[in-house]
Each structure stands twice: as structure tokens, then as C-alpha cells.
Amino acid sequence: IDLGGCSTRPGCTMPSSQEEMDRLRPALKLWRDEYSDIPLSVDTFRADVATMAVEEYGANLINDIAGGSEDDKMFSAVARLGVPYILMHLEGRVEGMHHEATYLPDVETAVLDYFVRKVDTLRQLGAKDIILDPGFGFSKSPDDNYRLLARCVEALAPLQLPILIGVSRKRMVWQLLESSAAEALNGTTVLHTIALLQGGADILRVHDVRAAVEAIRLVERMRPYLSL
């Protein structure tokens, strides 16, 4: 389960760090008391929130959509806490993440360069368990998103790190299909299947769990024959 207390949807007001923690604490307590057998990821770009979630409630992962850019203490906090860290690609700041950036020479090279720099810093600080999230829908045009989905596996291979794919209910899906986020299940499942067939989706971040599990089961059943 991925749990967050700071919405990043367009038009949302950014809460303070204290407000974010106040929102999270009741849910974290419920998880710790009733569901702690289920791994929990906390979605935050703030080091103090990450520290609270891990030290006070035992959260298992930190999912940082800012890739350490919003809080210069995040990387050292993650290294000290010793939990897996989801490092997402975001060009610029969180407040401007819905604006499209320009990538030269191309988006996959820019994303690789970004991850090389960030991973090097994390490793120097002692962080070991790093997961890469290419950041679909964040500071990218529709063309960037689809090009990156097609090429990220090959582009990020030199880093030899797990890749998380998060396209569930994203604008890149429902806008193209002229539907809505709530109606994007079919399109999301298609993209999940493509990502799985490419062999680069180690983790899928999803809203519709059953459909994603079915896609995984079908691809895994077919996988032995893909190289024949």
C-alpha cells in the first residue's frame, strides 16, 4: 500500500510539513495496529515526514516524487533509516511538475543522466536499496511519456536497479482515449502489459489491483515462450 498525506494534483494547496504528518498519523496508526503484515510505502518528499513514518510507525518504503529536490535532508535521512527508497524523475520543483519540460537530446537520455547523478549521491551517503521511477506524467509531454515507456528499460539498464512503472489512471492514458481517470482501467491494463512484456517493470504502482494482478499472471504464463 502506498500512503500519502500531500496531494500533488493540479490546483491543490500544498500542506505544511506538520499538516502532512497530522494527516498521516491516524492512517499510519491503523496500519501498524491492524495491517502491519502488509508492506507500507509512504509517499512524501519531506525528510521529517519520512523519518516520522519509519521511526514511529515502522513504514517499509519511502516514495519520493521529488527525487530529493524538495528537501536536501531527504537522501541522508533515507540512508540513515535504511529503508528502500523510490527515486522518481522530476525536472524542476513539485509546484511546477505539471508543466512540460524540454529534454535534450531526448527524454530517456535526460532521465538516465538524472538518475546517474542522484544514485551516485545516494550511494555516497550509504543508501543501498534504490528503486527507479521514470516519473510518467510529471514534467513530461504526452510524446515524452510514451517514448519513455517504450525505451526506459533499455535506457536505464546500465544502472542495474529495479524499475517502478506508474501509469495507472494517468492523464497520458485517459486523455488519449478521451475518457476520464475513473474510466482508464482498460488503457492502464494495456500499458501495464506492454511494460511487463518488455521485461522492465519490476514493480507496478496501481489503483486497480485485480486487473494488474491478472495482467501479471497472463504475461508470466506466456514469458517462457517469448524468446523461442
Regions found by a protein language model. Give the residues of each.
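N-terminal glycine-rich anion-binding loops that anchor highly charged ligand groups
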Residues: 1-5
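Active-site-adjacent loop and "lid" segments of alpha/beta metabolic enzymes
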Residues: 8-34, 38-41, 45-48, 55-124, ...
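Active-site metal-binding loops of divalent metal-dependent hydrolases
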Residues: 136
